[in-house]
Amino acid sequence: MWVQIKSAPNKVIAEMWKDFFEGEGIPIRILPDSEKLEYKERVPYKIYVSQERLHVVEEVLRKL
């Protein structure tokens, strides 16, 4: 199961978070925050992590 950990105002910021977490060895999914599911640059995005890795994300975010 995947849980939302952050929101991003656009795809560029979402990709930056994705790169950051994946650099820490944490698989991430990003999906547009839109019911139309349009994969455009300017729509807000949600950032998801698997439930099993949530504790790792919380620890990484604490260190920021």
Question: Where do the PLM segments sit?
Answer:
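Acidic/polar low-complexity segments and flexible, solvent-exposed patches
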Residues: 1-64
